[in-house]
Regions:
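Cysteine-dependent hydrolase recognition
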Residues: 1-300
């Protein structure tokens, strides 16, 4: 232990990152400083932080070709809630038009016909959607990643749907584990997605048909005044303290996600955390109706 206050600074900048249309940087503020030798705690009630631009290129430069003309509507909503200065930044710009972008569905060969109703529906509602057989791309994640990257630049890709279980549709491997979202990390070396990635996990045509039918019904027949649209569930283990995201335990990470959801449009987010959580809590939540479920922890 050293006779000094930690952390030494009151604020610091994180590494620059790219999230599709913008380059961002997080500012971390430390209103508490602790000296372990004197056991003294400093508490700052007011801190002013000045952030200045420099002429250096820095990490993860965003090489935009010309001025931004259009923006994916869903990403615009993300930007508004992600960047503290988004509205001020955009007020000094011309009007940027909303657009849908495009959707790419990569499927295991045996499920191609079962996906046609979904492709037809997506195109009918105005989202340009293309269905591709994974065998026409390549059977490994490197070939798929390159195809997705090329499609992103050529077709303004916004949504990627993988169809099939991992034995039929490989995932990107990160740290020895599969990571579907990594297919969406196109720009920079960060973990902020340029493309939203999902998967229909399926071992049979029946599995695919069920998910296709439910997806179409969810979009085509929205339920008026259904409160479950604004309810979610968070599931977290008691592990991970000190080694998780920003040193959080799994349940703390879920609580942070919960706070963001409650600050958005959600009215209720279940806290199914260890110790004490059980599968019955999850079953009850699902049967009552939830629009999103998040899990942080290890499988066994």
């Amino acid at each position: 232990n050293q006779d000094q206050f930690y952390p030494g600074g009151l604020a610091e900048l994180g590494n620059p990152y790219i999230i599709r249309d913008f380059r961002g940087q997080a500012v971390q503020v430390f209103p508490l400083q602790y000296n372990p030798v004197t056991q003294s705690l400093r508490v700052y009630t007011s801190i002013t932080v000045h952030v200045y631009a420099t002429d250096e290129i820095g990490e993860n430069p965003l090489n935009r070709q010309g001025e931004l003309q259009t923006m994916i509507s869903e990403y615009k909503s993300i930007y508004q809630h992600h960047f503290n200065n988004y509205n001020n930044f955009m007020n000094n710009r011309y009007n940027i038009l909303d657009e849908e972008g495009s959707m790419l569905i990569i499927s295991y060969s045996s499920f191609m016909d079962d996906l046609l109703p979904l492709v037809e529906w997506k195109n009918m509602r105005g989202l340009k959607t293309t269905l591709v057989d994974v065998n026409d791309i390549g059977s490994n994640s490197s070939a798929i990643s390159q195809y997705v990257e090329d499609y992103y630049y050529d077709e303004n890709l916004a949504y990627l749907l993988l169809v099939g279980d991992i034995a039929q549709m490989p995932s990107v491997t990160v740290g020895g584990d599969p990571s579907d979202p990594s297919y969406g990390f196109i720009e920079g070396n960060d973990a902020y997605p340029e493309v939203m990635v999902g998967r229909f996990s399926a071992e049979s045509a029946t599995h695919v048909q069920t998910q296709v039918e439910r997806s179409i019904n969810y979009e085509r027949y929205p339920m008026a005044d259904a409160d479950w649209y604004h309810k979610g569930t968070g599931i977290g283990s008691s592990e991970g303290s000190g080694i998780g995201d920003e040193g959080e335990a799994d349940w703390q990470h879920q609580d942070n996600i919960r706070a963001k959801l409650m600050d958005y449009t959600y009215t209720e987010v279940d806290q199914v955390y260890d110790p004490g959580a059980n599968s019955g809590d999850v079953t009850t939540a699902v049967n009552e109706g939830r629009s999103v479920m998040n899990y942080t922890g290890h499988g066994s």
